[in-house]
């Protein structure tokens, strides 16, 4: 490719609203162009990178037995009604009407669509298992699109779905796809982790995330320093903590505690640890057609994990869509006093009460007395009936691993893939069944598997690039080599550059010849910005010495290559990381 023919509209400065370096570099280097909030055009350089990512994905998925299809981006809303997700998914689901007043959605995921296909065409266990996948555009109407391709509204996704006759077959495919994803991300040259995760709006019994470690990541993962335990903070677990020695033993009594509304201030008032203070967190629960209140109790030195809390509510049948923090008006209407909320008589004020599992059968607790400026001491939870316990706390750094007691640490990460065991939920709601070996009708066991293809552009750059511009990995750079002519007006330099260009092309090197009538410094700046893997300099010294200066983009390391060894050395450098 000649640079003079390449459509790569680089900018002098990155967009003012760009925060992440990946967003800055992709926009400034002419990879992407924003046309609306969270909506981007992919220009030739970005398309080359996308094609490479997609080719790797196709190769690995098909090696693992998956078949490529292409489903409609527009789906009947009635399918989403049948699955129950039309209301559950929320405002991120874009719903519209056609001219005949039919309701449709722009797909953020395609569980309903693929399940309908299976229901219509898979009739017997003899056709199972089957794994179908696609790479296609998706749309999620994010409330705050940001960070360029990291949280866009329109994005490119690889999503796959598998159908099975039993849970054992699903388990095998879950691990098979996990292996495929590991190979894909390894081929892309990424440092990643596999972590246990929440299934979210997609649902299912088990899910794992594939996350790229980067300080700009939106997610926090909890990693054991001693074993391979890793989980998204939303579902991370810990070992039971040892009880502090300073136990506030007391007879059950009510004490005046003026102006002590925090767990820390209550602990200081009674000269004990926040561990023994029962902290109440009230949340407004949003249902499909109503709002209620829930109170969650954790120890005073713990924090509530909102995702765990929402899941705990739904396990007991709340059918909650989301949680919001209850404000002072909400508390006043319920007859509650912030800072003094406790379990005594609480059922008449809120619809749901859940205690963290770490509190089970705890005694010597200090709790709010549901009376302004009063707390109760010497409280024993064994004296209460029918309490609901669940894991609802957010794991802290220095907590201990649930598997080996090792120390837990936080890491920032960016999710790039997710695999789920969906079970029979979608099959039952959409009446997708087959006949088993005994001729009996059974519902499909389903798996769901996704990779954010367009997000991977940002993930690679967040992990690999520097302040100068894009640094791509071995298998993702838009070009292997850019040949930079020091002085294009020197016919000898120009002639040699074109000869070298042809020599490299014949060896299968994806080369870019910078034949633009521009300053040498500007050309090198574009090399740093765009991120070809190597820059080969053709200058006056090259003509005299028959040696080329070659620069690696990853570390800007310079190397001298003799003309006679040019192709061999370039291929060696490209073969290495």
From Swiss-Prot:
Q: What keywords were assigned to this record? A: Aminoacyl-tRNA synthetase, ATP-binding, Cytoplasm, Ligase, Nucleotide-binding, Protein biosynthesis
- Does 4Fe-4S appear among the keywords? no
Catalytic activities: tRNA(Pro) + L-proline + ATP = L-prolyl-tRNA(Pro) + AMP + diphosphate
Membership in a protein family: Belongs to the class-II aminoacyl-tRNA synthetase family. ProS type 1 subfamily.
What is the top EC class of this enzyme, as a single word? ligase
Q: Which Gene3D superfamilies match?
A: Anticodon-binding domain, Bira Bifunctional Protein, Domain 2
GO terms (molecular function) for this protein are: aminoacyl-tRNA deacylase activity; ATP binding; proline-tRNA ligase activity
Note the InterPro entries from the entry.
aa-tRNA-synt_IIb, aa-tRNA-synth_II, aa-tRNA-synth_II/BPL/LPL, Anticodon-bd, Anticodon-bd_dom_sf, Pro-tRNA-ligase_IIa, Pro-tRNA-synth_IIa_bac-type, Pro-tRNA-Synthase_IIa_type1
Function as written in the Swiss-Prot or TrEMBL entry = Catalyzes the attachment of proline to tRNA(Pro) in a two-step reaction: proline is first activated by ATP to form Pro-AMP and then transferred to the acceptor end of tRNA(Pro). As ProRS can inadvertently accommodate and process non-cognate amino acids such as alanine and cysteine, to avoid such errors it has two additional distinct editing activities against alanine. One activity is designated as 'pretransfer' editing and involves the tRNA(Pro)-independent hydrolysis of activated Ala-AMP.
Q: Name the Pfam families for this protein.
A: HGTP_anticodon, tRNA-synt_2b, tRNA_edit
Q: What does the entry list under GO cellular component?
A: cytosol
Cellular compartment(s)? Cytoplasm
Its EC number is 6.1.1.15
Q: Please report the name of this protein according to its UniProt entry.
A: Proline--tRNA ligase
What domain of life does the UniProt record list for this protein's source? Bacteria
- Quaternary state and interactors: Homodimer.
């Amino acid at each position: 490719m000649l640079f003079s023919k390449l459509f790569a509209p680089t900018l002098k400065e990155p967009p003012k609203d760009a925060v992440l370096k990946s967003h800055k570099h992709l926009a400034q280097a002419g990879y992407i162009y924003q046309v609306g909030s969270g909506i981007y055009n992919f220009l030739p350089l970005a398309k080359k990178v996308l094609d490479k990512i997609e080719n790797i994905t196709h190769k690995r998925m098909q090696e693992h037995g998956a078949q490529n299809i292409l489903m409609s981006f527009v789906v009947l809303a009635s399918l989403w009604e049948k699955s129950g997700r039309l209301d559950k998914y929320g405002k991120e689901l874009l719903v519209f009407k056609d001219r005949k007043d039919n309701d449709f959605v722009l797909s953020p995921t395609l569980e309903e669509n693929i399940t309908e296909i299976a229901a219509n065409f898979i009739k017997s266990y003899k056709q199972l298992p089957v794994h179908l996948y696609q790479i296609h555009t998706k749309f999620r109407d994010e409330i705050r699109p940001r960070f360029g391709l990291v949280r866009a509204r329109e994005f490119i996704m690889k999503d796959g779905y598998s159908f099975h006759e039993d849970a054992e077959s699903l388990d095998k495919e879950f691990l098979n796809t996990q292996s495929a994803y590991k190979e894909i991300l390894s081929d892309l040259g990424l440092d990643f982790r596999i972590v246990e995760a929440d299934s979210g709006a997609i649902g299912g019994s088990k899910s794992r995330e594939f996350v790229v470690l980067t300080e700009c990541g939106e997610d926090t993962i909890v990693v054991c320093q001693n074993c391979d335990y890793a989980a998204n903070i939303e579902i991370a677990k810990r070992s039971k903590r040892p009880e502090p020695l300073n136990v506030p033993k007391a007879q059950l009594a009510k004490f005046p505690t003026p102006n002590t509304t925090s767990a820390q201030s209550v602990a200081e008032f009674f000269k004990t640890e926040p561990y023994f203070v029962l902290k109440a967190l009230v949340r407004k629960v949003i249902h499909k057609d109503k709002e209620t209140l829930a109170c969650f109790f954790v120890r005073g030195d713990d924090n509530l994990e909102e995702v765990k809390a929402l899941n705990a509510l739904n396990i007991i049948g709340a059918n909650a869509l989301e949680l919001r923090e209850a404000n002072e008006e909400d508390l006043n209407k319920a007859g509650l006093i912030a800072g003094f909320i406790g379990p005594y008589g609480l059922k008449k004020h809120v619809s749901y009460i859940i205690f963290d599992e770490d509190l089970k059968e705890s005694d010597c607790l200090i709790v709010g007395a549901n009376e302004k400026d009063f707390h109760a001491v010497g409280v024993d939870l064994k004296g209460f009936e029918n309490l609901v316990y669940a894991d609802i706390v957010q794991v802290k750094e220095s907590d201990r691993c649930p598997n080996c007691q090792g120390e837990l640490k936080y890491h920032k990460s960016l999710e790039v893939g997710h695999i789920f065991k969906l079970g029979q939920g979608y099959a039952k709601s959409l009446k997708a069944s087959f006949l088993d070996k005994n001729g009996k009708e059974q519902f499909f066991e389903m798996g769901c598997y996704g990779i954010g293809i367009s997000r991977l552009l940002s993930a690679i750059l967040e992990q690999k690039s520097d302040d100068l511009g894009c640094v791509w990995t071995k298998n993702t750079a838009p070009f292997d080599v850019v040949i930079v002519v020091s002085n294009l007006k020197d016919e000898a330099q120009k002639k040699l550059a074109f000869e070298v260009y042809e020599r490299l092309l014949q060896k299968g090197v994806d080369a870019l010849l910078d034949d633009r009538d521009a300053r040498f410094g500007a050309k090198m700046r574009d090399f740093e910005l765009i991120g070809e893997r190597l820059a080969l300099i053709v200058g006056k010294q090259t003509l005299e010495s028959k040696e080329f200066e070659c620069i690696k983009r990853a570390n800007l390391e310079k190397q001298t290559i003799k003309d006679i060894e040019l192709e061999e050395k370039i291929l060696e450098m490209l073969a290495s990381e």
